[in-house]
């Protein structure tokens, strides 16, 4: 059965009432009619509003309005409840996974921006590499002007039996001449018996450095010649100090390293050694630190001779380097002699064998224009005296008498 309209039910009730009573008045009838009309108009307005709401809302979201009281159940708990049934429910837009590009620009995948710190790090590495490379180039340029390769060839050609000394000398010069600014001067101390080549190496060094830095920056000081007597010591001291100061100042101006060669140091007066010691102190002003001092003497030559003769059989087997073994003892001995040797690098010269003396004869005879006949050279070498240790022969005086023997030819 369908639901009966309330206005029809009310009208039926009103029509039945006059029939039952039969005696209702006209005024009562008219008031009832007016009430019925008002109810009907109100009902029609409510119905029209419901139809308008139903037509505006999509069919999927609409549900028939029930006049029965609403009872809460858990059946439709998952469905969203619209708090305002009068307002239309808006559709949620789904987010698209793809990237939307503007139509006015080229389509390109966005790139991740790289860190700028890496670029700065690369730039810093390049700068450091260039600085180091430039420093190495400058070191090479500074060494090249001293022509140490030419000095090495000269030592190999004219110095016999002192290979370790030549290698040590070139190593010290290479390290020191690589830079111009130093915190201390280079002090080299030559020691050994008579005739082993100490003064000869000093002359070769003087000739070489005169050719590369100039005559004014090389000084050869022979103690017995420049300061022969004790009365000359005060004058010699002032003259030496003044001369060294002038040469160092000139070296500073020309950015060159002066060379001072002192021969016969064993005869140098103590006052002169004290003055020289003050000039080469590492804590001295920078003016005196960029210089090379070479000290030549035969201090401790007797002990050096005994050491070489005692260890010659061991050294020939290659198990011992006489220079390395002799240096610690020589350092202690010379430091007790005077403080001038405290900061020195020691280069001990060994005894010369008979074969080395023969090389000296051949070289000297070639210089004097004689043909170096082998038998003649051996006969001249036999005239000298030697220390005999096993099968080895060491000359008492080295090559000192070679020049005199050749001059007698």
Swiss-Prot record:
Pfam families (alphabetical): TOR1A_C, Torsin
Recorded superkingdom: Eukaryota
Listed Polar residues bias regions: 17-28
GO molecular function, one term: ATP binding
Protein residues bound to ATP: 192-199
Extent of Basic residues compositional bias: 88-98
Keywords: ATP-binding, Membrane, Nucleotide-binding, Transmembrane, Transmembrane helix
SUPFAM superfamilies for the chain: P-loop containing nucleoside triphosphate hydrolases
Family according to the record: Belongs to the ClpA/ClpB family. Torsin subfamily.
PANTHER family assigned to the protein according to its UniProt record, in alphabetical order: TORSIN, TORSIN-4A
Protein name listed in UniProt: Torsin-4A
Originating species: Danio rerio
Designated gene of the protein: tor4a
């Amino acid at each position: 059965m369908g639901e009966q309209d309330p206005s029809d039910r009310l009208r039926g009730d009103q029509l039945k009432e006059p029939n039952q009573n039969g005696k209702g008045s006209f005024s009562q009838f008219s008031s009832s009619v007016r009430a019925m009309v008002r109810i009907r108009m109100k009902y029609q307005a409510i119905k029209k509003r419901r139809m308008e709401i139903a037509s505006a809302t999509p069919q999927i979201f609409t549900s028939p309005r029930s006049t029965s009281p609403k009872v809460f159940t858990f059946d439709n708990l998952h469905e969203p409840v619209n708090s305002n049934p009068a307002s239309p429910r808006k559709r949620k837009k789904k987010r698209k996974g793809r990237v939307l590009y503007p139509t006015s620009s080229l389509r390109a995948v966005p790139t991740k921006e790289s860190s700028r710190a890496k670029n700065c790090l690369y730039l810093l590495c390049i700068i450091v590499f260039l600085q180091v490379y430039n420093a190495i180039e400058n070191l090479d340029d500074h060494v090249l002007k001293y022509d140490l390769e030419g000095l090495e060839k000269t030592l190999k050609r004219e110095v016999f039996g002192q290979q370790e000394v030549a290698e040590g000398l070139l190593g010290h010069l290479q390290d020191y001449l690589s830079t111009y600014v130093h915190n201390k001067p280079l002090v080299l101390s030559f020691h050994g018996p008579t005739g082993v080549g100490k003064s000869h190496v000093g002359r070769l060094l003087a000739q070489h450095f005169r050719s590369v830095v100039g005559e004014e920056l090389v000084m050869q000081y022979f103690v017995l010649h420049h300061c022969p007597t004790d009365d000359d010591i005060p004058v010699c001291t002032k003259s030496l100090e003044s001369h060294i100061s002038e040469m160092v100042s000139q070296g500073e101006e020309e950015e060159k390293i002066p060379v001072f060669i002192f021969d016969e140091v064993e005869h140098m007066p103590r006052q002169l050694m004290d003055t020289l010691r003050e000039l080469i102190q590492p804590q001295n002003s920078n003016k005196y630190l960029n210089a090379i001092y070479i000290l030549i003497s035969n201090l401790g030559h007797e002990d050096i001779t005994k050491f070489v003769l005692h260890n010659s059989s061991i050294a020939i087997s290659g198990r011992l380097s006489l220079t390395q073994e002799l240096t610690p003892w020589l350092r202690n001995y010379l430091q007790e002699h005077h403080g001038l040797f405290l900061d020195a690098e020691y280069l001990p010269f060994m005894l010369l064998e008979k074969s080395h003396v023969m090389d000296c004869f051949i070289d000297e005879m070639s210089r004097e224009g004689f043909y170096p006949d082998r038998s003649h050279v051996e006969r001249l070498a036999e005239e000298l005296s030697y220390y005999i240790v096993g099968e080895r022969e060491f000359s008492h005086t080295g090559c000192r008498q070679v020049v005199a023997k050749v001059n007698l030819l």
